[in-house]
Amino acid sequence: MVLKVFSIITIISLTFAGESRSDDLAYQLVLEKINKKVVPTSYIDEIFNNPSIEKHLEIPERFAKPYEKKSWEQYKKLFIKESRIVAGVKFYSENKDLVFQVSKKYDVDPFIILSIAGIESNYGRHYKGFTVFNSLYTQIHEMPKRAKWASNELASYLEYCYKDNVDPQSIEGSYAGAFGFGQFIPSSFNRYSVDFDDDGVRRPHDWPDVLGSIANYLV
């Protein structure tokens, strides 16, 4: 009897899950855009059934007041300050060999690489707030003008997660959907990220891969 009840509940749950997916704009758009030769539909179905999916209404509010719209005088105060300079000097002293190794391989000025790492995440101190999935999911549903862009990025993100065996809800990033210490959007991560330490995985929070990816982006 218990088994029968459980079976009925399971069938009902799967039925409603299917209906909710068919009505989900994000699911529909991602299904259209994702490379199904790389990512099977069954994987997409599984991801969109995750109970951790949610929309964050704070995200449209953040877009309405972006840092990038500030004047240079305001913007400068966020980045050129004593604490960030100290963090940069400390990071350089601890990672000097790696920085020059990356610089030599890609023929990119080491201090440009360092500066970008400082601007994008303050050397790994400021890089997250929302899961990448939920950020892009929210943009699709709550920001119609960004839906096309966000669905392309969500498709790119799921391609990365599938290839590298990463839980899509495990990575946090900015309100815009950029992630990792280099703050790449998913399509750029797929295009420019490198496995600099040759461990078989492109890791957005490991400095060898991060610095290598930043340099590769600049080449």
Which residues does each PLM region occupy?
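Short, conserved active-site entrance elements at the starts or edges of catalytic domains
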Residues: 156
